[in-house]
C-alpha cells in the first residue's frame, strides 16, 4: 500500500516545541516511521520553509518527506497559509505527475492539509482519511482569556472536512464526542486510533540517571522539581503553572521547589518574555528555569529530572507529553480536559485538576510533592500504563483502518457541492 500523508503547515522533521511544531509533528513522524516498518510506503507532503531542504528527504526505507514550494519560505504565519492552498496543491500534483506516482489513500492532518486532501481525493479518486488534531469549535470553547479565538473561516473548513472525508480518525472517544457535538459528524465514519509514545526512548532512569539529568539542567539535587514541556502559548497553560508556583511559595516560602519550563514561542498571543515577565512580577523568577525546546533524545533528561510533569492545557486531543512523561516514570498532574483523562490514569499514574484556578493547581501539586510514597508508586505504575500506548500499536491500527477504507465503498473520488452535498 502507498499512502500520501499531508502536513502542509508544519514539517514532521521540525523540532517539536518550536513555532507551530508540537505533538502533531511527533504523531506524523512516529506513525509514518512505524507504518514504513510494517511495509506501507509513506510520502509526507509538507510546505518547504527553506531552500536548502531539498525536495525529497528519504527518512527511512519506505518513508519520504516531500518539501513543496508554496509561497515564500519565510514570513507567513500559520493563519496566513490558507492563501497558499492552491499553490501547495499544485505542487503536490506536479510532483506526482512528474514521478508517475499513484497512491492508494490520503491521510491529511489538520484542517489546512485536509482542504488539500479533499481536492486530491476527488482528483485521484481514492479514499481520504482525515485527522483534525485540534478543532476550532473546541479551542474556542476552552480557550484561555489571553488566547486569540480561532476564526469562523477555519470552523467552516473543518465542517466541510467532517462532511466530506471518507474516514475521520480521532485520538479518543472524547474527541469523537466533540466531533458529533460541535460538527454533527456521523459516528459511523469516525474511528478511534490511540496515539502512543516512543517507549524505547522514553524509559525510566535510576537514581544515578536522575542525578545526572539534574546536573545537566542545573537543578539542585535535593529540590522538588515540577516541569512543563510544550509550546509557550496561553492554550497550553504555562501561566497557570507559574501562578500556582507563586501560590505554593506564598504559603511556604521555604519550600524547596524548582520549576523547569521547556518550550519555544508559538502563535501571536504570547512570547517567552511574557512568561519570564510574569515570573518576575510574581516574585518566582529565581525558582523557574526556562529551557529551549529539545529533541526527543535530550527531552528524556527533562522528564527524568522532574518529580512531576504539569500539563495545564485548556484542551488536548490526547496529550503526548503526559504519555512520554509517564513512560519515563514521572507522574503527571494534568487538567481534566479532552483526552488527558485517557492519557493519565487518575489516582494511579497522576492526578487530574478541574479547571485552571491556580489555588486548586497549587493544592494538587502539593498533594504529590509532599507525599513521596504515593508519588513514587504513581511513577512506577505510570511506566506500566505507558506500555499500553506504543507507536507500533498505533501504526497497526492505522494500517487496518487504511485497508478497510481502500476496500470499502467510500465516497473517494465522488465530488460534492460546496455545501457538502453530493452531486446527483
Curated annotation (Swiss-Prot):
GO terms for molecular function: acetylglucosaminyltransferase activity; D-inositol-3-phosphate glycosyltransferase activity; magnesium ion binding. GO terms for biological process: mycothiol biosynthetic process. Keywords: Glycosyltransferase, Magnesium, Metal-binding, Transferase. It comes from the Bacteria. Its EC number is 2.4.1.250. 1D-myo-inositol 3-phosphate binds at residues 9, 20-25, 78, 110, 134, 154. It catalyses: 1D-myo-inositol 3-phosphate + UDP-N-acetyl-alpha-D-glucosamine = 1D-myo-inositol 2-acetamido-2-deoxy-alpha-D-glucopyranoside 3-phosphate + UDP + H(+). Mg(2+) binds at residues 303-304, 306, 330. Catalyzes the transfer of a N-acetyl-glucosamine moiety to 1D-myo-inositol 3-phosphate to produce 1D-myo-inositol 2-acetamido-2-deoxy-glucopyranoside 3-phosphate in the mycothiol biosynthesis pathway. Homodimer. Belongs to the glycosyltransferase group 1 family. MshA subfamily. PANTHER family: D-INOSITOL 3-PHOSPHATE GLYCOSYLTRANSFERASE (PTHR12526:SF510), GLYCOSYLTRANSFERASE (PTHR12526). This is D-inositol 3-phosphate glycosyltransferase. The gene is mshA.
Amino acid at each position: 500500500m502507498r499512502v500520501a500523508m499531508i502536513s502542509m503547515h508544519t514539517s514532521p522533521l521540525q523540532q517539536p516545541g518550536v513555532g507551530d511544531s508540537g505533538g502533531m509533528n511527533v504523531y506524523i513522524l512516529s506513525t509514518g516511521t512505524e507504518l514504513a516498518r510494517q511495509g506501507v510506503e509513506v510520502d509526507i507532503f509538507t510546505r518547504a520553509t527553506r531552500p536548502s531542504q531539498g525536495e525529497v528527504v528519504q527518512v527511512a526505507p519506505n518513508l519520504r518527506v516531500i518539501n513543496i514550494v508554496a509561497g515564500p519560505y519565510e514570513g507567513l504565519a500559520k493563519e496566513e497559509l490558507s492563501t497558499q492552498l492552491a499553490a501547495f496543491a499544485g505542487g503536490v500534483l506536479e510532483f506526482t505527475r512528474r514521478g508517475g506516482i499513484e497512491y492508494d489513500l490520503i491521510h491529511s492532518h489538520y484542517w489546512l492539509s485536509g482542504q488539500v486532501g479533499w481536492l486530491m481525493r476527488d482528483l485521484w479518486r481514492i479514499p481520504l482519511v482525515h485527522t483534525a488534531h485540534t478543532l476550532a469549535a473546541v479551542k474556542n470553547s476552552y480557550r484561555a482569556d489571553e488566547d486569540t479565538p480561532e476564526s469562523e473561516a477555519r470552523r467552516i473548513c473543518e465542517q466541510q472536512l467532517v462532511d466530506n472525508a471518507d474516514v475521520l480518525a480521532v485520538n479518543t472517544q472524547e474527541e469523537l464526542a466533540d466531533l458529533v457535538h460541535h460538527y454533527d459528524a456521523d459516528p459511523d465514519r469516525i474511528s478511534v486510533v490511540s496515539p502512543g509514545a516512543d517507549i524505547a526512548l522514553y524509559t525510566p532512569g535510576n537514581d544515578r540517571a536522575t542525578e545526572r539529568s539534574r546536573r545537566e539542567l542545573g537543578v539542585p539535587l535535593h529540590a522538588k522539581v515540577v516541569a512543563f514541556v510544550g509550546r509557550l502559548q496561553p492554550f497550553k497553560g504555562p501561566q497557570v503553572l507559574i501562578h500556582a508556583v507563586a501560590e505554593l511559595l506564598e504559603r511556604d516560602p521555604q519550600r524547596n521547589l524548582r520549576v523547569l519550563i521547556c518550550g519555544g514561542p508559538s502563535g501571536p498571543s504570547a512570547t517567552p518574555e511574557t512568561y519570564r515577565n510574569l515570573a518576575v512580577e510574581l516574585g518566582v523568577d529565581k525558582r523557574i528555569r526556562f529551557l529551549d525546546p529539545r529533541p526527543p533524545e535530550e527531552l528524556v533528561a527533562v522528564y527524568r529530572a522532574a518529580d512531576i510533569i504539569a500539563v495545564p492545557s485548556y484542551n488536548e486531543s490526547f496529550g503526548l507529553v503526559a504519555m512520554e512523561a509517564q513512560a519515563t516514570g514521572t507522574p503527571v498532574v494534568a487538567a481534566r480536559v479532552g483526552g488527558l483523562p485517557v492519557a493519565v490514569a487518575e489516582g494511579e499514574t497522576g492526578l487530574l485538576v478541574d479547571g485552571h484556578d491556580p489555588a486548586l493547581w497549587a493544592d494538587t501539586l502539593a498533594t504529590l510533592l509532599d507525599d513521596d510514597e504515593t508519588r513514587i508508586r504513581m511513577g512506577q505504575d505510570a511506566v506500566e500504563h505507558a506500555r499500553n500506548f506504543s507507536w507500533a500499536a498505533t501504526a497497526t491500527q492505522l494500517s487496518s483502518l487504511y485497508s478497510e477504507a481502500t476496500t470499502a465503498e467510500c465516497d473517494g473520488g465522488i465530488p460534492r457541492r460546496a455545501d457538502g452535498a453530493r452531486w446527483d
